[in-house]
Amino acid sequence: MTDAPVSRIRNFCIIAHIDHGKSTLADRLLQDTGTVANRDMQDQFLDNMDLERERGITIKLQAARMNYTAAHGEEYVLNLIDTPGHVDFSYEVSRSLQACEGALLVVDASQGVEAQTLANVYLALDNDLEIIPVLNKIDLPGADPDRIKEEVEAIIGLDCDNAIPCSAKTGLGVPEILQAVVDRVPPPKDAVEEPTKALIFDSYYDPYRGVIVYFRVMSGRINCKDKVLLMASKKTYELDEIGIMAPDQKKVDELHAGEVGYLAASIKAVADARVGDTITLVNAPADEALPGYTEAKPMVFCGLFPTEADQYPDLRDALDKLQLSDAALKYEPETSSAMGFGFRCGFLGLLHMEIVQERLEREYDLDLIVTAPSVIYKVNMIDGSEVMVDNPATLPDPQKRESIEEPYVRMEIYAPNEYNGALMGLCQERRGDYIDMKYITTDRVTLIYELPLAEVVTDFFDQMKTRTQGYASMEYSLIGYRKNQLVRLDVLINGERADALTTIVHQDKAYNVGKALVEKLKELIPRQQFKIPIQASIGSRIIASTSISAIRKDVLAKCYGGDISRKKKLLKKQAKGKKRMKAMGKVDVPQEAFMAVLKLNDGGGS
């Protein structure tokens, strides 16, 4: 049934926090509508990557078309557009929301509203979506649907009288959800006769067919014989095929306004078919593109280096291929005195960084060294110019710069109020400015802080979860740059600057961080046959130092008794050799040492 009238199409997505049962609910909807046969069913059906199933998160968007017969006997087409729930992927979420008219807000009936759910709900409200609250996991012993309804009403302002209780695990409440989608989500605008415009909401790279683009037709129609124009990249393509996801791909001849489908057109790279771009026809182009297209800006940067120098071309190929399916990943070549050739990569956030690293190691079989993540600093120079620095090692000299500004975020933390003190302590340690505190219910509180992004990208999230036994959740948004007393902290190993260990820290914290860093490196760097000094410096001033003592080789082992002058000669020769070794010797710094920079907070540093 591909020729469904617009009035019988419903496009919707599911908004939920990680672990609140979004993928399980999607599985049940596919099963209940007969879209996926029971024998083909596997958990998290729409999460294609192994990594997604393992971590239990949705990274890339998927879409599925379901045929559904409503209670009054009419047939409908329901397009479910799956969305990632994590804050790093909010741009992916905003595009998928633009392709929908409604959203199921899934809230865990035992845990309540979480911060990232809220962020996505606000995005949905911005897009004028009809929101249907669903209380999931009501079969759990700790479920308290009435309290959660009150919470949703208090925090989001949604009327929860007709919230649907369900259990995605057992299938309870799923038929009611499908009926509610038909009854409450508005049909798409009937714009079949208007000029063709389609919104790209996802794309992925297929090694055989090039880029496969997922799109929603907003107006007009697209035929499999058309020639299309992508309005942001200004590129034109002959279509190879178009089709629908059911949820496996099925070819069709034509898709009209309101429908969701995919196209293949031998597109070489995902960057040519960017998410949020508008597809139109070459022979009858639309006057203007659909609103809301922005390029995803990387927020967190780190260096990626292969452990073996000859793997550099492989890493470049892997990044090229990964960028085909991940347009938010940015990278450029970089050389480091300590690590040789590698790449400086930009990511949307820490989770995005971890996932890219894991995919490179898994899918492309690479061994990588990853440097500590950093953010983009704005450096005001004495000559009046501005320099943006994403690599601490390239920070201009103190004599040339007037001030350094760093990005700040506004953070909202939701938690049970018994953890208030622990969270305020954490935010203060991280140079946070207290803004406000609101009680949502009698036992849940929202803390609002403004703090530097650099303090968030290391292990803020882990620390927050640890100090609140996993009960707190957070979301943050960028609010601009602020001046701070920042300095560059260098690490010298055996007198050589290890640029991969360079960090930018606040002046007041520099001594503690430096001290903790050299002590940590002393534990992690293996001993050599010569003494290795490890120093932390700001400019030319050494602020902390320690050294790794040499392994002593017993050169006198062969001298049984014998002449003292013979022993002296051997010891002198050894001392000479050590001197030469020290001058020539390269110290291998293990990967753990680079990661130690991240984890310094455990050692009372940054």
From Swiss-Prot:
UniProt-recorded Gene Ontology molecular function terms: GTP binding; GTPase activity; ribosome binding
Keywords assigned by UniProt, alphabetized: Cell inner membrane, Cell membrane, GTP-binding, Hydrolase, Membrane, Nucleotide-binding, Protein biosynthesis
InterPro entries: EF-4, EFG_III/V, EFG_V-like, EFTu-like_2, G_TR_CS, GUFP, LepA_C_sf, LepA_CTD
SUPFAM superfamilies: EF-G C-terminal domain-like, P-loop containing nucleoside triphosphate hydrolases, Translation proteins
Catalytically driven reaction(s): GTP + H2O = GDP + phosphate + H(+)
Binding sites annotated in the UniProt record for GTP: 19-24, 136-139
Source superkingdom: Bacteria
Subcellular location field: Cell inner membrane
Disulfide bonds: none
UniProt domain tr-type G: residue ranges: 7-189
PROSITE patterns linked to this entry: G_TR_1 (PS00301), G_TR_2 (PS51722)
EC numbers on record: 3.6.5.n1
GO cellular component, one term: plasma membrane
UniProt GO BP: positive regulation of translation; translation
Pfam families per UniProt: EFG_C, GTP_EFTU, GTP_EFTU_D2, LepA_C
Membrane topology annotation: Peripheral membrane protein
UniProt family annotation: Belongs to the TRAFAC class translation factor GTPase superfamily. Classic translation factor GTPase family. LepA subfamily.
Function of the protein: Required for accurate and efficient protein synthesis under certain stress conditions. May act as a fidelity factor of the translation reaction, by catalyzing a one-codon backward translocation of tRNAs on improperly translocated ribosomes. Back-translocation proceeds from a post-translocation (POST) complex to a pre-translocation (PRE) complex, thus giving elongation factor G a second chance to translocate the tRNAs correctly. Binds to ribosomes in a GTP-dependent manner.
NCBIfam families per record: lepA (TIGR01393), small_GTP (TIGR00231)
Protein name: Elongation factor 4
